[in-house]
Swiss-Prot record:
<dbReference type="GO" id="GO:0140463">
    <property type="term" value="F:chromatin-protein adaptor activity"/>
</dbReference>
<dbReference type="GO" id="GO:0000723">
    <property type="term" value="P:telomere maintenance"/>
</dbReference>
<protein>
    <recommendedName>
        <fullName>Telomere length regulator protein rif1</fullName>
    </recommendedName>
</protein>
<dbReference type="GO" id="GO:0005730">
    <property type="term" value="C:nucleolus"/>
</dbReference>
<dbReference type="GO" id="GO:0140445">
    <property type="term" value="C:chromosome, telomeric repeat region"/>
</dbReference>
<keyword id="KW-0131">Cell cycle</keyword>
<feature type="compositionally biased region" description="Basic residues">
    <location>
        <begin position="1240"/>
        <end position="1249"/>
    </location>
</feature>
<dbReference type="InterPro" id="IPR016024">
    <property type="entry name" value="ARM-type_fold"/>
</dbReference>
<keyword id="KW-0539">Nucleus</keyword>
<dbReference type="GO" id="GO:0000785">
    <property type="term" value="C:chromatin"/>
</dbReference>
<feature type="compositionally biased region" description="Basic and acidic residues">
    <location>
        <begin position="1151"/>
        <end position="1174"/>
    </location>
</feature>
<feature type="compositionally biased region" description="Polar residues">
    <location>
        <begin position="42"/>
        <end position="52"/>
    </location>
</feature>
<comment type="subunit">
    <text>Recruited to telomeres by interaction with taz1. Does not interact with rap1, unlike the orthologous protein of budding yeast.</text>
</comment>
<dbReference type="InterPro" id="IPR022031">
    <property type="entry name" value="Rif1_N"/>
</dbReference>
<feature type="region of interest" description="Disordered">
    <location>
        <begin position="1"/>
        <end position="63"/>
    </location>
</feature>
<feature type="compositionally biased region" description="Polar residues">
    <location>
        <begin position="1090"/>
        <end position="1099"/>
    </location>
</feature>
<feature type="compositionally biased region" description="Polar residues">
    <location>
        <begin position="1177"/>
        <end position="1230"/>
    </location>
</feature>
Length: 1400
């Protein structure tokens, strides 16, 4: 058995009365062992056939009265066994029960004395456990007959004439049970009961009274429950008690029991005899016999119950205390005896309760003026200081009696002194090391003290005194800081702040046997709690810091009450929410927020701030847990007061504390900006953001901020609150993570608020109104802040906010407001943050592109009106495009290929949506950024990423295509975009160069102007050596005008011939697959054609070392330099115009032979000579044609596969429609051919060709021309179309690799160096280039050339002759006259037509 059980029994048994009749009372032991284990005597098994059932509600006697007796077998025994068994056996029918009871009574008439004794014993055992079935129980009619037998037998004599002790004893025992039984005694007639009591009094007053009989009859008087029969005999009973003089312990106990019974039945009559029983009671309280002391204690305790504040009793007791016994006051004698009991006998439990009984009898009025009160206090002081924990617990319980009598005070001064006295033993126990049982007993006393002080109608001054003296000094400073008592302390606070409590305060509650529980405490006045918020919140703050996780709280279960060690987070949250509701209830009826409520809000917010930043009191506390609890506490406060109270900006922050603004002063007089409580709390939480707590703070911040959306505030107020959340974080550079966190939540909630506002306005049938200027201003400020401080991962949330903002403006303001309210402000925002992280800016710029300005406006405005709408906001549009241009210029510096590709793709999609009237204007604004993209020499990752190559190529081709389809004229393009065109021609990307040449031929091929920039002319002139390009400008050709005029007629004839050839080609076996409706497969990347679908080009075998090259050899130094240049990479020369050949080289290192057909020439087919035909520069109009050797010609004749040279075109799926091309039958071998000559051999041949001089013999020249004519094959090309139209290409032919690698852009010649002959030769060169490109109509000349018969002589002879003639012409070209040169040109055109007709 634990000590807690012993404490409870020791404190409660003194308050219990004897519940069953007993010949000897059972009291408390003087030691813990005796109080824990008590002797109990049961009836003999021989006397009772059953051990008896459970104790009934009215009690059982603890010991049998009679000794064991042997049953007589000769006498018929009534069957009472069936009533003493289990519950099933007790369900005998009423008839059987009545017959059995009747048989027992009949036996009393006929049996002998010994049989009656046994019958009485059996009936006693039966009636003790029997519960009658009212109101028709079969026993009730037989009670009178049984009483008659008892009346005769309890006074019968034996044969010698003396009283028969055994029979009398059994009869008295049975009679005591009948009069004690709560149900049976009420069915005994009062007259019969009075006869029994008078008969007992006669025995007690008679001369033949013995000690045994006296004890039996006194026990009957103490057990009876017949008040109607006792009332006339009350004084007589008291006299008998006082006159019995047997020095017996049993008689002393029974006498005190009789006095206690009379006190409970007739307290007034008992109080009148106080003079008789008071000295006896006080003497028994200090008696040497423990049972006597305990019986006296029960009587004293009943005095406080039945004669509470009886003045006569109190005066008599005080008079007896003052009485002099041998020169010493009786009170001093009692004090001395009590000290001995505490110190020597360790019976402090009894002393404490006796001390409390006297206090209750005297009352508070007598105590305050009693001269021996301090002496009396020394007795309980010994109990408080005892080493016995049971004595300490009893002392705490007894102290409640003094609290009950001493707590009521008339003045504040008196109340202060009394509270100081009453709190001292409680704080002493709670503030020092003691056993948990002692501390729990002290907590019970504390609850009783609070209960006694919180009387109805208590004044505010008394309430403040109670709070400071009890709650602060004891509860907060002592009880809350111990894990044994903290849970009960939280229950006290819950009860005090619970506004829903409806408990009724009772004046005599502390006198009751049961202890007061915390839930019975009266609630505090909410108005007083709010007015004293700074004081009442302190214990709550302490409790919050001391709480622990729920799983760490330990629960112990002593005998009667469950004890919890520690305080859980859940319990602390309950205390906080209850306290907040108490504060809020004080202002429920307020129409406008009062000053008191405002101060309470300040107190709450400041306390939450301290809770968040206070140092940990518990060693095992995790700060993460505190952040989560902070969010729950804030939400409970908002729920209690309402969101409007927490969003009112009527507060200031001073020293990190929230202060209410004085309404009498102007807001401008304050240095700080007003702030709302919600923003103050959110800012306090955001300052904790770091790497460890980021996720926890993020979750807490999101939980609190969601209140803005939950309570359905108006849209403008939501925006203002969200702006207040972010504005304090702008100036502090150390709050990087806090900005990221807040940006994520604010951008999300702003988007949700906009979406909700859109839905609400759409659901409203009223006229839709736009946003106010203030709302738009706040939205833009929120966008600006989030763009500046959000993380890359949150850029999507900000982009969503921009999209929602655009939708709202477009919906309520119209399409015309998009540019001034969305595009221009957001562009300004991005301009301001260009110095920040590049990835974010590009993401936001892409989002701005996705705001479908043109597409959305088109839905509302017709296409004709759309350009006008843009013109109205041209400044905003230009501002946006200039931003894109700036980002495009910086794009090459990024090291993220995905970002570069994405930006180029999104910019392409944006440009496609622009009306064609603004394409030229937009490209002009983007020209500075487009130049690096066209050159492609500023992208470090270009060589490693085929994706980036493809993106850049597609982007550049799209720009050229859109510019071609725009409304801009050639002069406008030349004036504004010549640097861009020059960049395209100088690009390191082969596809971009080809697209630029195509664009040149289509736009400027026939456009003559004196304003061609020199750099453009130089670039075109340089490329004309490699490609067939129309050269309309004359800045490098001083004599070009006359030559052009002389050859204009011939050019028109050539153009006609080309048109005729086009018509023939379309119907030929190699017609373009575009006419067949086939699709084109997209290439895998720039410079790398797809293996499944590519353009088939005529291949040419490598020239033999003996037959290729021109006169002269390359110097050794130049040759070494060339060999070293072959080893260098692209990035070493990508910025020089002289390295254009590297961009035209395939990944395998082979030179592509490609053709671009001009719009005026072949649309579906193109013809390329064997090798690249190099047009002579401005000083030499010579045809430089590579011819293969005899061995190579022989290999070709034998069917050796030749090199496949592919032309790759970057496709743009968005701007063009692809058309497939299928190879005609018979050309598969040409497509699948491979290069049989090693690469090293080819390189040597190329170097050899370059090193040869221009003076070669006639035979070699004729053989080269013959080889050229013999190895020309057909070329199949893709067609590029947009909107159903084919994209035409200008024809161009590449030279071999060696000629490209060593060619440089010629420097501009002076006027002295430029002659009329050079200009004339330039004009002839352009004619010849046009002829090779197929731009000259050859329809009129087809018959002349086609009549040449190659079959009459051998092909070798014809080629040899032409080679000799060619070398002869080269040797004497300078001596020819202009007419002769003109004739030579005609011959060459005829030869070209013949070649073309043979190919077709």
């Amino acid at each position: 058995m634990t000590k807690e059980i012993a404490v409870k029994e020791a404190s409660n048994m003194l308050l219990q009365e004897p519940s069953t009749p007993s010949s000897q009372a059972v009291g408390l032991s003087s030691s813990p062992s005796s109080s824990i284990r008590k002797k109990k005597v049961n009836f003999s098994s021989e006397l009772e056939n059953s051990p008896g059932g459970n104790r009934p509600s009215f009690g059982l006697p603890k010991r049998g009265i009679l000794k064991t007796s042997t049953p007589l077998s000769s006498i018929k025994q009534p069957n009472f066994q069936s009533f003493e068994g289990n519950e099933s056996e007790k369900e005998t029918s009423l008839q059987e029960l009545q017959s059995s009871f009747c048989s027992g009574i009949e036996n009393l008439q006929h049996v002998e004395k010994s049989a009656r004794i046994e019958t009485y014993s059996k009936l006693s055992s039966f009636l003790k456990i029997y519960t009658p079935s009212l109101p028709e129980d079969p026993i009730f009619p037989l009670l009178n007959q049984l009483c008659n037998f008892l009346l005769s037998d309890r006074c019968s004599n034996n044969s010698e004439g003396s009283p028969d002790f055994q029979l009398n004893t059994q009869a008295n025992k049975l009679l005591s049970i009948l009069l004690w039984h709560p149900t049976i005694s009420s069915h005994i007639q009062p007259e019969t009961a009075t006869v029994f009591i008078e008969q007992s009094l006669n025995f007690l007053e008679g001369p033949k009274l013995t000690k045994a009989l006296a004890a039996q009859h006194l026990h009957l008087l103490s057990c009876q429950k017949c008040p109607l029969s006792i009332h006339p005999l009350c004084n007589r009973i008291l006299d008998v008690c006082f006159n019995i003089s047997f020095p017996s312990l049993v008689i002393g106990q029974e006498r005190l029991a009789v006095l206690t019974k009379i006190l409970s039945q007739f307290p007034l009559e008992f109080s009148r005899r106080v003079v008789d029983w008071a000295p006896y009671l006080l003497a028994c309280l200090v008696d040497a016999s423990r049972p006597i002391r305990e019986k006296a204690l029960l009587l004293a305790l009943d005095l406080s119950k039945h004669l509470y504040h009886d003045k006569l009793v109190a005066r008599t007791i005080l008079a007896n205390f003052r009485s002099d016994i041998k020169g010493t006051a009786f009170v001093l004698i009692m004090t001395e005896q009590f000290e001995k009991l505490v110190i020597e006998e360790d019976d402090g439990v009894y002393v404490a309760h006796a001390w409390a009984a006297i206090i209750s009898v005297l009352g508070g009025a007598r105590i305050s003026s009693w001269e021996y009160f301090n002496t009396w206090l020394k007795i309980i002081q010994l109990c408080f200081n005892s080493m016995n924990p049971l004595t300490k617990c009893a002392a705490q319980t007894s102290w409640i009696r003094l609290i009950h009598e001493f707590s009521l005070s008339e003045t504040l001064t008196q109340a202060t002194k009394r509270l100081t006295l009453l709190c001292q033993p409680i704080s002493m126990v709670l503030g020092s090391r003691n056993l948990p049982t002692v501390k729990n007993a002290a907590m019970t006393t504390l609850i009783a003290l609070i209960y006694a002080c919180l009387r109805p109608g208590i004044s505010d001054a008394m309430l403040s005194l109670l709070w400071d003296s009890v709650i602060v000094n004891i509860l907060e400073k002592c009880a809350l800081k111990n894990e044994v008592t903290i849970f009960e302390s939280s229950n006290i606070l819950l009860a005090l702040f619970n506004t829903l409590s409806n408990g009724v305060w009772k004046d005599d509650r502390l006198v009751c046997r049961e202890s007061v529980e915390a839930k019975e405490l009266p609630k505090l006045n909410p108005v007083w709690v709010r007015a004293n918020c700074s004081r009442t919140i302190e214990p709550v703050k302490t409790l919050l810091l001391l709480a622990k996780p729920d799983h760490t709280v330990k629960t112990t279960t002593p005998a009667r009450k469950q004890h919890i060690r520690g305080l859980s987070y859940e319990q602390s949250s309950s205390v906080w929410s209850t306290y907040i509701k108490c504060l809020a209830s004080a202002g429920q009826k307020e129409i406008k927020r009062s000053v008191e409520t405002g101060r309470a809000i300040c107190c709450i917010c400041s306390s939450l701030h301290k809770f968040l930043y206070s140092k940990s009191i518990r060693k095992d506390e995790l700060y993460v847990e505190r952040v989560s609890r902070f969010a729950l506490m804030v939400k409970s406060a908002i729920e209690a007061f309402g969101i409007n109270t927490f969003v009112e900006a009527s507060y200031l922050v001073s020293d990190n504390q929230l202060v209410l603004i004085d309404q009498t002063k102007a807001i401008d007089s304050y240095d700080h900006v007003p702030i709302s409580p919600l923003i103050y709390l959110l800012h306090s939480l955001a300052l904790l953001t770091n790497g460890t707590l980021f996720s926890t703070v993020h979750a807490a911040y999101s939980s609190i901020l969601s209140s803005i959306e939950e309570y359905h505030l108006r849209f403008g107020l939501k925006l203002m609150l969200l702006w207040d959340c972010v504005s304090p974080l702008s100036d502090d550079g150390t709050l990087v993570l806090a900005r990221v966190l807040v940006s994520h939540e604010v951008s999300r909630l702003t988007s949700e608020a906009l979406l909700s506002e859109l839905k609400s306005r759409n659901g409203n049938n009223s006229v839709e109104e736009g946003f106010s200027e203030e709302e738009r201003s706040i939205l833009l400020k929120l966008l600006s802040w989030n763009v500046k401080f959000c993380s890359i991962s949150d850029a999507g949330s900000v982009n969503n906010l921009l999209q929602q903002y655009f939708t709202a403006i477009y919906k309520f303001e119209g399409c015309g407001s998009v540019f001034p309210f969305v595009v221009d402000p957001f562009t300004t925002i991005l301009d301001d943050v260009l110095s920040f992280e590049a990835n974010k800016v590009y993401s936001f710029a892409i989002s701005l592109m996705k705001v479908s300005t043109f597409e959305s406006c088109t839905k509302e405005l017709p296409p004709v009106t759309l350009p006008e709408n843009i013109r109205q906001h041209l400044d905003s549009y230009n501002h946006m495009v200039e931003l894109y241009n700036t980002l495009l210029q910086r794009l090459s510096s990024s090291d993220q290929v995905d970002l570069q590709c994405r930006y180029l793709h999104e910019l392409s999609e944006f440009i496609k949506k622009i009306p064609k009237e603004f394409i030229f204007h937009t490209i002009c604004k983007l020209s500075k950024g487009l130049i690096p993209c066209f050159l492609m020499n500023a992208f470090p990752q270009l060589e490693k990423s085929t994706t980036l190559q493809k993106s850049c190529t597609n982007f550049c081709i799209l720009i050229l295509q859109l510019l071609l389809n725009s409304t801009a004229t050639a002069s406008n393009i030349l004036e504004s975009l010549s640097p861009l065109l020059t960049s395209g021609l100088k690009s390191i990307s082969k596809e971009v160069v080809l697209a630029a040449i195509k664009f040149w031929n289509q736009v400027f091929g026939k456009f003559e102007s004196e304003e061609y920039p020199i750099e453009l002319q130089k670039t075109i002139s340089y490329l004309s050596k490699t490609y067939i390009i129309l050269l309309p400008f004359q800045s490098l050709c001083p004599g070009g005008k006359q030559a052009n005029h002389q050859s204009s007629e011939k050019m028109s004839d050539i153009l006609k011939g080309v048109d005729e050839l086009r018509s023939v080609s379309k119907n030929g076996p190699y017609a373009s697959s575009q006419d067949k409706g086939e699709k084109t497969t997209e290439f895998s990347g720039p410079g790398k054609p797809n293996n499944d679908n590519y353009i088939q080009i005529a291949s040419v075998q490598e020239l033999d070392d003996s037959s290729k090259g021109k006169a002269g050899k390359m110097p050794a130094s130049k040759k070494n330099k060339r060999q070293k240049g072959d080893v260098k990479k692209i990035d070493e020369t990508k910025n020089e115009a002289t390295d254009m050949e590297e961009s035209l080289t395939t990944p395998s290192g082979k030179v592509n032979k490609e053709v671009i057909v001009d719009d005026t020439s072949l649309r579906d087919e193109a013809i390329v000579p064997d090798k690249a035909i190099d047009v002579a520069d401005n000083s030499n109009a010579l045809l430089k044609e590579n011819i293969s050797s005899q061995s190579n010609r022989k290999a070709d004749n034998n069917g050796t596969p030749s090199v496949n040279n592919s032309f790759t075109t970057a496709n743009n799926d968005e701007c063009s429609k692809e058309n497939s091309q299928i190879e005609p039958e018979g050309q598969t071998a040409s497509r699948e051919g491979v290069l049989s000559t090693p690469r090293s051999t080819r390189k040597k041949r190329k170097l050899g060709r370059k090193s040869q001089s221009s003076n070669v013999n006639k035979e070699v020249a004729i053989s080269e021309v013959s080889a050229t004519l013999e190895n020309v094959e057909v070329i199949e090309r893709h067609g590029i179309s947009e909107q159903g139209q084919n994209l035409d290409e200008s024809a161009c032919v590449l030279t071999n690799e060696s000629s490209l690698s060593q060619t440089e852009i010629p420097e501009e010649k002076t006027e002295n160096e430029t002659t009329a002959v050079n200009g004339f030769e330039n004009s002839k060169k352009r004619q010849f280039s046009s002829l090779l490109s197929g731009s000259i109509d050859t329809n009129n000349e087809s018959n002349k050339v086609s009549s040449v018969e190659f079959d009459k002589s051998g092909p070798q002879d014809i080629i040899q002759s032409m080679t000799e003639a060619t070398f002869e012409i080269e040797k004497n070209i300078q001596d020819l006259k202009s007419e002769e040169v003109q004739k030579l040109s005609d011959l060459l055109m005829r030869l070209q037509r013949a070649i073309l007709s043979r190919i077709a």
